[in-house]
Amino acid sequence: MLKSTDVRLIINNRIKSFTGIAQDRIQWTNQPNFKIPLEGLWCRVTIQYSDSQSAGFFTETLERDYGIISIQCFARKGTGDAALIALAQAWRDHFHHYRNGDFEVTMTNAPTEAMDDVQGDFVMSLVRVEFRVN
């Protein structure tokens, strides 16, 4: 049975194996000293858990966890969105049907069309990767 620390390692390793953008352009959750690039694309990755459910009773209860990896891809306003959408699609392809032991991606949502970011300097495309553990 995988624990949350095991799952985090699996997800982190999968993100690190992505070659669609340089790793120094990926902002991780609670990453210190990340600098938003002045030019070009960059991404922000967050991992959120949702409900847990009892999936079976053997010698102990098996808990099945669910979660979402949110990958926000950013481009500065006025630079076009073709490369942005292509990057988001590459992330989707990278996670599509990915499985590692008891970790399984159950759905990769199509990237959203580019939309304004709340900061106002960027347009963003979002990829949601839904997963199940155990």
Language-model segments: what does each one mean?
Residues M1-T61, T79, A90, Y98:
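Small/polar-rich, solvent-exposed N-terminal microdomains that initiate assembly or binding
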Residues A22, Q89-N134:
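Acidic-leaning, charged glycine-interspersed low-complexity segments
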Residues F57-R64, D117-G120:
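Short, solvent-exposed beta-strand/turn "edge" segments of beta-rich domains on protein surfaces
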Residues L62-K77, V123-N134:
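Oligomerization/assembly interface segments of phage tail-like spikes and tubes
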Residues S70-A90:
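Mid-chain, well-packed structural core segment of small domains
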